[in-house]
Amino acid sequence: MARSKIALIGAGQIGGTLAHLAALKELGDIVLFDIAEGTPQGKALDLAESGPVEGFNASLKGANSYADIAGADVIIVTAGVPRKPGMSRDDLLGINLKVMDAVGGGIKQYAPDAFVICITNPLDAMVWALQKSSGLAPAKIVGMAGVLDSARFRYFLSEEFKVSVEDVTAFVLGGHGDDMVPSLRYSTVAGIPLTDLVKLGWTTQERLDAIVERTRKGGGEIVNLLKTGSAFYAPAASAIAMAEAYLKDKRRVLPCAAQLSGQYGVDNLYVGVPVVIGANGVEKIVEVTLDESEKAMFAKSVESVRGLVEACKVINPALAG
């Protein structure tokens, strides 16, 4: 039985961490691609040399040619410029849009059957542009945002309640930006709704509201602390969870940026919603019921994404077709 092939486009902090996690989990053979000569080769060799210690047998290869991603089963895209202090995700739009055009062309030519996970920011607009440039079916290309944002939300809640993160269930809707919608109503601790925990005196509504706001600003908090880059451990772990769900046909319910076609009243936009990921990619979009407050917040988030997509069309009119 042939091993799966995983291509990682971008050999920066996230790309290197993705390669390490994929190797440790033995998800398949790994190609680390970057336009910077020597960088992917050096990281691939370094990781391969950790194999005898870690006990994994994955093949790792560094590459500067898209031809090396040929036949990939999964492609994870991190290529582009990361955020720096003072930058919004949206400031990256013009720079990273050009990167998505090049990456999409490479995928279209060499790996048109892959399941693609995009991490590049501004996420919802970049995965939309990547779908356009690659020509992949919408079910085979998603954005990694909700798993990460939900993980941050779960971590903050576990810290508040002083319980294991394993017992905290939470998810985040909407775009991957300051207008995201961390859902208190659909979040629980061991099945107990957060509203009940407020009544039990475990926390207050004000403290929960502060956690929601911290979740929205979670990426920026790390950017400001690092000063020279952005988060990479948690984003990489989140994308690997998505890749594993696809490769192992787990049918996991994960919040991802998926293309909507009428769900939540939205058409032809990539927005963060719960989806089922299995061997066919996005197998189902889960349309949860939103109350009036959540609908208003979700609509605001969708409009933010729509604004970015319209800006993409202005920068590159070819995407408007």
Swiss-Prot record:
EC number: 1.1.1.37
Keywords: NAD, Oxidoreductase, Tricarboxylic acid cycle
Active-site annotation: 176 (proton acceptor)
List of residues binding substrate: 83, 89, 121, 152
Binding, NAD(+): 10-15, 34, 96, 119-121
GO MF annotation terms: L-lactate dehydrogenase activity; L-malate dehydrogenase (NAD+) activity
Family of this protein: Belongs to the LDH/MDH superfamily. MDH type 3 family.
Descriptive protein name: Malate dehydrogenase
Organism: Methylocella silvestris (strain DSM 15510 / CIP 108128 / LMG 27833 / NCIMB 13906 / BL2)
